[in-house]
């Protein structure tokens, strides 16, 4: 059952020039569209689910569509829009190019009481698989207005002493993440044709437990 008082936003992004203009959420991984994979997971933890996009174009079937309030400001503008447009105090924000999200991880993130709950993988903070409260909106808006656009810099800044801007933050480090990501797939994204081919190969070559876990998330 979705958690009460929790929404989810999928950031559709811009023109996907590195993918030749293809709509990344419509790409298929293992024969299933990335968007369908994400919806199968998000519907089990959040309601409603809506899309945020910075460009005019086709809307995502069945989802409310919100126009990015800070176009050309990168992912941080989409994060702000998602928080500001959400009907609930807490919102899961995910990028549209992450095909391997899991219910278990999102349930863990949403169980933690903080204004920002964010994974920190081996490569750093993952601001596009995180839970934000409405309290994050105003500090993010101020950063956008002064041109501080790097999404990963946000949690780094808030972790500094006396720099939290009144926002509480909890990070989920690599040691904890391993329990939710034994096959190392969670934060694989699809930004380029190379990424797309790699993601499909990961599914094709994955172990049987990995394939079973992915299909279980889809309710198969």
Question: In which residue ranges do the predicted regions lie?
Answer:
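Conserved active-site beta-strand element of glycosyltransferases/polysaccharide synthases
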Residues: 189
């Amino acid at each position: 059952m979705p958690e009460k008082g929790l929404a989810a936003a999928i950031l559709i992004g811009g023109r996907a020039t590195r993918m030749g203009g293809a709509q990344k959420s419509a790409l298929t991984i293992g024969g299933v569209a990335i968007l369908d994979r994400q919806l199968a997971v998000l519907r089990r933890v959040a309601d409603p689910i809506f899309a945020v996009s910075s460009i005019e174009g086709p809307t995502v079937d069945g989802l409310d569509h919100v126009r990015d309030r800070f176009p050309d400001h990168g992912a941080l503008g989409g994060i702000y829009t998602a928080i500001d447009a959400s009907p609930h105090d807490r919102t899961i924000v995910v990028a549209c190019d992450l095909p391997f999200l899991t219910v278990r991880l999102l349930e863990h993130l949403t169980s933690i009481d903080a204004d920002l709950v964010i994974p920190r993988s081996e490569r750093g903070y993952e601001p596009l698989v995180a839970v934000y409260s409405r309290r994050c909106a105003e500090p993010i808006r101020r950063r956008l207005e002064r041109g501080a656009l790097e999404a990963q810099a946000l949690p780094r800044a808030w972790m500094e002493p006396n720099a939290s801007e009144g926002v509480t933050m909890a990070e989920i480090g690599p040691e904890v993440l391993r329990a939710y990501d034994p096959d190392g797939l969670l934060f694989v994204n699809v930004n380029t044709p190379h990424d797309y081919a790699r993601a499909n190969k990961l599914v094709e070559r994955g172990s049987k437990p990995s394939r079973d876990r992915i299909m279980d998330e889809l309710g198969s």
